[in-house]
Amino acid sequence: MSAPRILFLFNHDAAHQAAHIAGLAAAVARRGVAEVIIAYGTPTIRAVVEGLLSPGDAAKMQWAPLDLTPVLDTALAPLNRVAPVRRLARLVRHRALFASVDIIVSPERTCLRVKRALGERAPRFVFVPHGAGDRSVTYHPEMAQFDLMLVSGQKVVDEMGAHGIMPPERCRIIGYPKFDTVDMTERPRFFGNGNPVFLYNPHFDPYLSSWYDMGHAVIALFAAHPGLNLIVAPHVMLFRKKLHYSLEYRTMRRRPEIPAGLPANIRVDTASERLFDMSYTRAADVYIGDVSSQVYEFLAH
């Protein structure tokens, strides 16, 4: 009997979900009980995933780029600023790859389009949440289409059951895999002083985020108090688009820009890997946020 083929799906335009399943892929590869396929959306995503793995673990895996044709990629670029059309196009273009495996492990639910399209030919789909947040979208009815959920704790099991999404017997508590990719004893330092460090972590959703109405006021408060350090580190998707639309709340808003001329006690990062590798949550003394599960990552230290 041949070994099962397990595909770990990294199909996003940003790399913030990678650390939630990369370690699981490594653990399966080390056991040698299955073929492990890493399906990735962009070269940047691959680089981030490889950075989370040891060279030995990476060598045990098959790497499958979810490429689009240059013409299609270019044609979708304008629409992709508003909706995740490239992500959806990859799922259609590489449907044969998905049909060739036994299990697909994903940190988000877009992949369920593949399951519905393949019907009886579909592999089993396993969900690993990219975080442990409590937004209503976490309990979207589509989530019931997953065959198994690997979750961080009993809270998630209870809530999935309470919302009629997943019975307890189809959930497994595995902890928070992202913690396995980070040295929790290290505390990064971003300011040349011993002043308290506040982390401001606004979300991108225009209905839920504080950035649209209060972001500039938060920055102004710290600009007026140089004895307090502020790291402005929003959800990585906030500054990837100027116009944000919330499917969940049917709300669209234009994102305000970062104000100019900020003092030295304010650090702004809108695009680097530090936004999601826990550098800032480990550095902070105080967390200011909206709905992100980064609050749990802050509490972990």
Regions found by a protein language model. Give the residues of each.
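Receiver (REC) domain switch-region micro-motif
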Residues: 6, 104, 149, 198, ...
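Short hydrophobic/charged patches on amphipathic alpha-helices used for structural packing
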Residues: 93-95, 219, 276-278
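A donor-sugar binding/catalytic signature common to diverse glycosyltransferases
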Residues: 127, 272-301
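Flexible, charged surface loops at secondary-structure boundaries
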Residues: 1-3, 29-33, 96-101, 119-120, ...
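Conserved catalytic-core segment of nucleotide-activated headgroup transferases in glycan assembly
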Residues: 17-31, 179-257
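Active-site donor-binding acidic/aromatic loop of nucleotide-activated sugar
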Residues: 264-273
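Nucleotide-activated donor-dependent transferases that construct or modify glycoconjugates
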Residues: 2-14, 199-200
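Active-site and donor-binding regions of nucleotide-sugar-utilizing enzymes
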Residues: 9-27, 38-183
